[in-house]
C-alpha cells in the first residue's frame, strides 16, 4: 500500500513538474479537439505560408496534445528537469524525489511507446504509398512503340472537327499502321472526313478497313507569334506543360525544342490530367469547316481578311468522347457517382498543386470525359493555355502591375485572385484557387446551376459574393459532400481546405465508413483498415484487364497516403457529423 501511495504521489508530482518546466506549445491540430480546416492538407498549418521552392515538410504521425511538449529529445527534457529539481533540492533527492523520478520514468516509457507506434504507422503508410505511386504513374501512350513517328502533320489522317475554343480548333485524327492503309484511305477519299460519312456496309455498320480516330489534334490559332518556330514555341509554351518527354523530341522546322530554365515546368503524368503525345509546328492546312467556323484565324492565302500566320503549333492527344458540359447536358449522375466525379477533379488539382502549377481556367468545357466498362465517367483536366507553371515563382505570382495576367476564366476566378490589387509587393497566391473552382463546378456535377454563371438575382460574382448567398444543395446530396462544397467556396483561402484534405474527406466518406464508425480512432485499427484496402485494391486491379473508376480512385488515394493528412480528414469528418 505504501509503495502504491508513493507511486501515485510521484505521478502527481511528476506531472506538476512537467507542466511547470516544459515549454508551452502553440495551438496545434492533431488528435485533440478538431481545429478549423484552414490550411489543412499536405504538411500545412493554419497561417503557414510555404515558399515556392521549399520542399514539403516530412509528415509523420502527430502525438496527442497532452504529449506535444515532447517535441524536443525525451532524454534531454528528462535531464533538464532533473538538473532543475536537484538544484532546488540542494542535497539530493530523498525517497519522495526517487518516487517522482520513478513515476517520470514510467511516463517516459509510455510516451516512447506511443512514439514508436506513430513511427510504425507512418512507416506503413510510406510503404503503401510507394507501392501505389508506381502504379498510378503509368499513363498509356498509344504512340510509345513509334518513338520517331508522328512529328509531322502528314503522318496523320484528319477527320471531322471535334470543337473549337478561344484559341484553337480540335480535329479527330488517326495514324495509319502501315503505308498501304494510308494509300487505301486516300483512295477511298477519307482524308478530311469523319466516321459519320465513311462508307457503310450492307448492315449499316462501318465498312471493313475504314480507319477509326483515336487521336485529337489541336491546331492553335497563331495571330501574334509570327511564323518562326522559335517564336511559336515561346508564345505557346504553356500548351506544352502536360507534354511527355517523347512528345517534344521532334524537329520544329529548323529548330530542335529545348526546355529552358526560364520556360514553364513539365507536368508529371496523372490519370486525371490530359497527356500530350506529340507536339510539332507545321504549315496551317485548310481543314474541314475552317472557312465556316473560323475564317478570321486563317492565313490570308486561304481567306483574304484572315489574321493568322502561315505556321502554327499542333498538339496530338487522346480523343475523348465528350466534355463534362456535354455529358451533364445529357445525363444527371447519381449522388454517389457525382461525389466520385468531384473527387477526381480534386485528385487532379492536388497533383497540380504538388507540382507547383495552377490551371487557372477550370470549367466544364475544359474537362474531358470517358467511361469505364461499367459506364462510370472518368474525368480528365485539359487545356493548359492559361496555366501558371513558372519555375521561379511557383504558385505565388508577383502582381506588381495591372498588366500581369490573372488567368483565363473570370467567372470561376477565386476571390483572392479576382480581388487582388497590384502593387510593388503584391502577390497572388494560387495554391487554393483551382480548389475553389472545383467547388463551383461541383454544383453542375450534382445537377444544379453553377451559381457563378448566368444573370439575374441568382447570379453570384466571385469578387463580391457572401457565403450565405450560396444556394443550398438538395437533401439527395450526401451531407459530407454538401459541407465540403461550401467549405471549398469559402472566400478566405486560409479557411478553405486544401485539395488533398478535400480529396481525403471524400475518400473516407465513400469507402471509410468502418473507420469513421470507431468511437476512438486508434492507429492499429487505422493501419489494419489501410492494409485491407490495399490488398482489396491490388486484387481488383489484377482481376480486371482495365481498372474501373472506383479501383482507380482507391489507387490514387493510397498513392497519396500520409498518416497525418488522413487523421486530419477523419477529424474534420467527425466534427461535421457531430455538429447539429
Curated annotation (Swiss-Prot):
Side of membrane Cytoplasmic, spans: 111-580
In this UniProt entry, the residues modified to Phosphoserine are 227, 401
- Broadest EC class assigned to this enzyme: transferase
Keywords assigned by UniProt?
ATP-binding, Autophagy, Cytoplasm, Kinase, Magnesium, Membrane, Metal-binding, Mitochondrion, Mitochondrion inner membrane, Mitochondrion outer membrane, Nucleotide-binding, Phosphoprotein, Serine/threonine-protein kinase, Transferase, Transit peptide, Transmembrane, Transmembrane helix
Q: Can you list the GO cellular component terms from the UniProt entry?
A: astrocyte projection; cell body; chromatin; cytoskeleton; cytosol; endoplasmic reticulum; growth cone; mitochondrial inner membrane
Transit peptide, UniProt annotation: 1-77
- Which effect does the record note for changing residue 361 to A? Abolishes ubiquitin phosphorylation
What is the recorded membrane topology of this protein?
Answer: Single-pass membrane protein
Which InterPro entries does the entry mention? Kinase-like_dom_sf, MitoQC_Scaffold_Kinases, PINK1_STKc, Prot_kinase_dom, Protein_kinase_ATP_BS, Ser/Thr_kinase_AS
Membrane-spanning ranges: 94-110
Q: Which reaction does it catalyse?
A: L-seryl-[protein] + ATP = O-phospho-L-seryl-[protein] + ADP + H(+); L-threonyl-[protein] + ATP = O-phospho-L-threonyl-[protein] + ADP + H(+)
The protein's matches in SUPFAM superfamilies, at most eight in alphabetical order, are given as: Protein kinase-like (PK-like)
Residues covered by the Protein kinase domain: 156-510
Entry function:
Serine/threonine-protein kinase which acts as a sensor of mitochondrial damage and protects against mitochondrial dysfunction during cellular stress. It phosphorylates mitochondrial proteins to coordinate mitochondrial quality control mechanisms that remove and replace dysfunctional mitochondrial components. Depending on the severity of mitochondrial damage, activity ranges from preventing apoptosis and stimulating mitochondrial biogenesis to eliminating severely damaged mitochondria via PINK1-PRKN-dependent mitophagy.
According to the record's subunit comment, the protein's assembly and interactions are: Upon mitochondrial depolarization, it forms a supercomplex with TOM and TIM23 complexes. PINK1-TOM-TIM23 supercomplex formation requires PINK1 interaction with TOMM20 and TOMM70 and is critical for PINK1 stabilization at the outer mitochondrial membrane, kinase activation and downstream mitophagy. Upon mitochondrial depolarization, interacts with TIMM23; the interaction is required for PINK1 accumulation at the outer mitochondrial membrane, kinase activation by autophosphorylation and PRKN recruitement to mitochondria. Interacts with PRKN. Interacts with FBXO7.
State the name under which the record lists this protein.
Serine/threonine-protein kinase PINK1, mitochondrial
Organism field: Mus musculus (Mouse)
Q: Which gene encodes it?
A: Pink1
Amino acid at each position: 500500500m505504501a509503495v502504491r501511495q508513493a507511486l501515485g504521489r510521484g505521478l502527481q508530482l511528476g506531472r506538476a513538474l512537467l507542466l511547470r518546466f516544459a515549454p508551452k506549445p502553440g495551438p496545434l491540430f492533431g488528435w485533440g479537439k478538431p481545429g478549423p480546416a484552414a490550411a489543412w492538407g499536405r504538411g500545412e498549418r493554419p497561417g503557414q505560408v510555404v515558399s515556392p521552392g521549399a520542399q514539403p515538410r516530412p509528415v509523420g504521425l502527430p502525438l496527442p496534445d497532452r504529449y506535444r511538449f515532447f517535441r524536443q529529445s525525451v532524454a534531454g527534457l528528462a535531464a533538464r528537469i532533473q538538473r532543475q529539481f536537484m538544484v532546488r533540492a540542494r542535497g539530493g533527492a530523498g525517497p519522495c524525489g526517487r518516487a517522482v523520478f520513478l513515476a517520470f520514468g514510467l511516463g517516459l516509457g509510455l510516451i516512447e511507446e506511443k512514439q514508436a507506434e506513430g513511427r510504425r504507422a507512418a512507416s506503413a503508410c510510406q510503404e503503401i504509398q510507394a507501392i501505389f505511386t508506381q502504379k498510378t504513374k503509368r499513363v498509356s501512350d498509344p504512340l510509345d512503340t513509334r518513338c520517331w513517328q508522328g512529328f509531322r502533320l502528314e503522318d496523320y489522317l484528319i477527320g471531322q472537327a471535334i470543337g473549337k475554343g478561344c484559341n484553337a480548333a480540335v480535329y479527330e485524327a488517326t495514324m495509319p499502321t502501315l503505308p498501304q492503309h494510308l494509300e487505301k484511305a486516300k483512295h477511298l477519299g477519307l482524308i478530311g472526313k469523319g466516321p459519320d460519312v465513311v462508307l457503310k456496309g450492307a448492315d449499316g455498320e462501318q465498312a471493313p478497313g475504314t480507319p477509326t480516330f483515336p487521336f485529337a489534334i489541336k491546331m492553335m490559332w497563331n495571330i501574334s507569334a509570327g511564323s518562326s518556330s522559335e517564336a511559336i514555341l515561346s508564345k505557346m509554351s504553356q500548351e506544352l506543360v502536360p507534354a511527355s518527354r517523347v512528345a517534344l523530341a521532334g524537329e520544329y522546322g529548323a529548330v530542335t525544342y529545348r526546355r529552358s530554365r526560364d520556360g514553364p515546368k513539365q507536368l508529371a503524368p496523372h490519370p486525371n490530367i490530359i497527356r500530350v503525345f506529340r507536339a510539332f509546328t507545321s504549315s496551317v492546312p485548310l481543314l474541314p469547316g475552317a472557312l465556316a467556323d473560323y475564317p478570321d484565324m486563317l492565313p490570308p492565302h486561304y481567306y483574304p481578311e484572315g489574321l493568322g500566320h502561315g505556321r502554327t503549333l499542333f498538339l496530338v492527344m487522346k480523343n475523348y468522347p465528350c466534355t463534362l458540359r456535354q455529358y451533364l447536358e445529357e445525363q444527371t449522375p447519381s449522388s454517389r457517382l457525382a461525389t466520385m466525379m468531384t473527387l477526381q477533379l480534386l485528385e487532379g488539382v492536388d497533383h497540380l498543386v504538388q507540382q507547383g502549377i495552377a490551371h487557372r481556367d477550370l470549367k466544364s468545357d475544359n474537362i474531358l470525359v470517358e467511361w469505364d466498362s461499367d459506364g462510370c465517367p472518368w474525368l480528365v483536366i485539359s487545356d493548359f493555355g492559361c496555366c501558371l507553371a513558372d519555375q521561379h515563382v511557383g504558385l505565388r505570382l508577383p502582381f506588381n502591375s495591372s498588366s500581369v495576367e490573372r488567368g483565363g476564366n473570370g467567372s470561376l476566378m477565386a476571390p483572392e485572385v479576382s480581388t487582388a490589387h497590384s502593387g510593388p509587393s503584391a502577390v497572388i497566391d494560387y495554391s487554393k484557387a483551382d480548389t475553389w473552382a472545383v467547388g463551383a463546378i461541383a454544383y453542375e456535377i450534382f445537377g444544379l446551376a453553377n451559381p457563378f454563371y448566368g444573370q439575374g438575382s441568382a447570379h453570384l460574382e466571385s469578387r463580391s459574393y457572401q457565403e450565405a448567398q450560396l444556394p443550398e444543395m438538395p437533401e439527395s446530396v450526401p451531407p459530407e459532400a454538401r459541407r465540403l462544397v461550401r467549405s471549398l467556396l469559402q472566400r478566405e483561402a486560409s479557411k478553405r481546405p486544401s485539395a488533398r484534405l478535400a480529396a481525403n474527406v471524400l475518400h473516407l466518406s465513400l469507402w471509410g465508413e468502418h473507420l469513421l464508425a470507431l468511437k476512438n480512432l486508434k492507429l492499429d485499427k487505422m493501419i489494419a483498415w489501410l492494409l485491407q484496402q490495399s490488398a482489396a485494391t491490388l486484387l481488383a486491379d489484377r482481376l480486371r484487364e482495365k481498372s474501373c473508376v472506383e479501383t482507380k480512385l482507391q489507387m490514387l488515394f493510397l498513392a497519396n497516403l500520409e498518416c497525418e493528412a488522413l487523421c486530419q480528414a477523419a477529424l474534420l469528418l467527425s466534427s461535421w457529423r457531430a455538429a447539429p
